[in-house]
Amino acid sequence: MVSKLSQLQTELLAALLESGLSKEALIQALGEPGPYLMVGDGPLDKGESCGGTRGDLTELPNGLGETRGSEDDTDDDGEDFAPPILKELENLSPEEAAHQKAVVESLLQEDPWRVAKMVKSYLQQHNIPQREVVDTTGLNQSHLSQHLNKGTPMKTQKRAALYTWYVRKQREVAQQFTHAGQGGLIEEPTGDELPTKKGRRNRFKWGPASQQILFQAYERQKNPSKEERETLVEECNRAECIQRGVSPSQAQGLGSNLVTEVRVYNWFANRRKEEAFRHKLAMDTYNGPPPGPGPGPALPAHSSPGLPTTTLSPSKVHGVRYGQSATSEAAEVPSSSGGPLVTVSAALHQVSPTGLEPSSLLSTEAKLVSATGGPLPPVSTLTALHSLEQTSPGLNQQPQNLIMASLPGVMTIGPGEPASLGPTFTNTGASTLVIGLASTQAQSVPVINSMGSSLTTLQPVQFSQPLHPSYQQPLMPPVQSHVAQSPFMATMAQLQSPHALYSHKPEVAQYTHTSLLPQTMLITDTNLSTLASLTPTKQVFTSDTEASSEPGLHEPSSPATTIHIPSQDPSNIQHLQPAHRLSTSPTVSSSSLVLYQSSDSNGHSHLLPSNHGVIETFISTQMASSSQ
């Protein structure tokens, strides 16, 4: 017995008195048990009690089918709620209606959470979706889900509607399996009456037992035959019957949950589509764009993967490897007269034989066009180099590039670091680079070098005597099989105030003795008078015959022709001799003279460094030239 009123009860009494109701009328209304009991059974079912209704708790379950007018009849939003399933009890026979009311009243007296778990288990056992419960009872989908899954409190009127549906559904399912062989249902008119309200039918839903059987079959065979599908139908229906606690012979009682051959076929087709989609998604993710910033491949197809990268000096080479383009740098060579003398800005590039085809010698990036002409075409008709690799951005941005084109021989002079090129190119006069283009036929191909503020002058120098090598030393044994065999003579000379010439002999075996060095291109910077002093001379040297580094290749002893430029200081004349190292200098610049050799022949190219350690240069292992 409650001695004091709660705050809510006090507010309710105050509201009744303020509405104009007198105390006498209120007491008289409380003294009338009939109407008040039917109105107040909802709150009292939850344990709430008022002064005059404490002794009426035992009468709460009665009158479930009667009309109620308390706050229990309203929803959470305050709207009136009248479960339609409760009104349908009037359509049943008196015996059936009395039986259902008795069962529902017994469920209302039990723990709501225990009954909710029982209803949820029944839904899962028979693969009944909650949508069917919502359509039949008119309950809120979210409220029903929370009540069944979390035990959220539900008003008595709504629970009575849920329990009424539960009792009726049990009776319908039992009748289905009992009369499965007859193909008819006793409660069919009542069952059809409910779904027609929204014009919807129960959707087929795969049960856990059937899914387990189908997934095991999918692992064995992703596309079963018709006979295999029919076997799976029997297994699934048997499992569904066992799950529901009935005999497999009553499989027709599954109703809308009956497994058919068409449904099994659709299930396998959907699984195959899902697997194909996941595979495609995985392949798209795997074959996506690489995170690296480089747009081009790191190594071309014709590069040698076995070439050791440690052959270059790691102290000077910054990321320069065989088959890779180096970063473009600009080296300003100081001069004694003040100011930079020569600026060389060209990266080391590998030229493939396919890049030297006549159809691929046009370069729009270099703003040069090629045209056929006489022995010495004009400067405006120069051709540029092409390579399979994409050129670095720094190369396209700098206009001071040494562009050379020769069929079949091409080479490029790359930039050097100031620390390494400084001692080499420091002079008081103009500097000149002499590049030899070796081929079996005399050609006159112009070379332009727009370095600094002056235009380079081009002039070929013809040599009638061929050069015969007496030395052949391998440069890099791991890549000898990838290096082509072709004649080549490259001479790089630096003309200081007293001119000095650096020359070397080619290391090519089995070449023709005619027209080996038909011409040499001279690239001068500022002093054009130095061209007049260049005179070809012949010096004969006799040496013993040395065997080639490759078996089966021998060279006879023969005179060798060198290029001599008169110099005021003979001590500055340097000669490049063959060696096994890239350079005799302890520090080798990553940018210098590069020789390229095509891969369709079997020769070898070598490095001939300076004996005095003045020139810091290296020669690569490829020359785009074919002289077979």
From Swiss-Prot:
SUPFAM superfamilies xrefs: Dimerization cofactor of HNF-1 alpha, Homeodomain-like, lambda repressor-like DNA-binding domains
PTM sites of type Phosphothreonine: T74
GO molecular function, one term: DNA binding
Pfam families in the cross-refs: HNF-1_N, HNF-1A_C, HNF-1B_C
Sites bearing Phosphoserine, chain numbering: S70, S93, S247, S313
Changes after translation: Ubiquitinated in s SPOP-dependent manner; leading to prteasomal degradation.
Domain POU-specific atypical residue range list: 87-182
Assembly: Binds DNA as a dimer. Heterotetramer with PCBD1; formed by a dimer of dimers. Interacts with PCBD1. Interacts with BHLHE41. Interacts with NR5A2. Interacts with SPOP; this interaction promotes ubiquitination and degradation of HNF1A.
Protein name as annotated: Hepatocyte nuclear factor 1-alpha
The species this protein was found in: Rattus norvegicus
Gene name of this polypeptide: Hnf1a
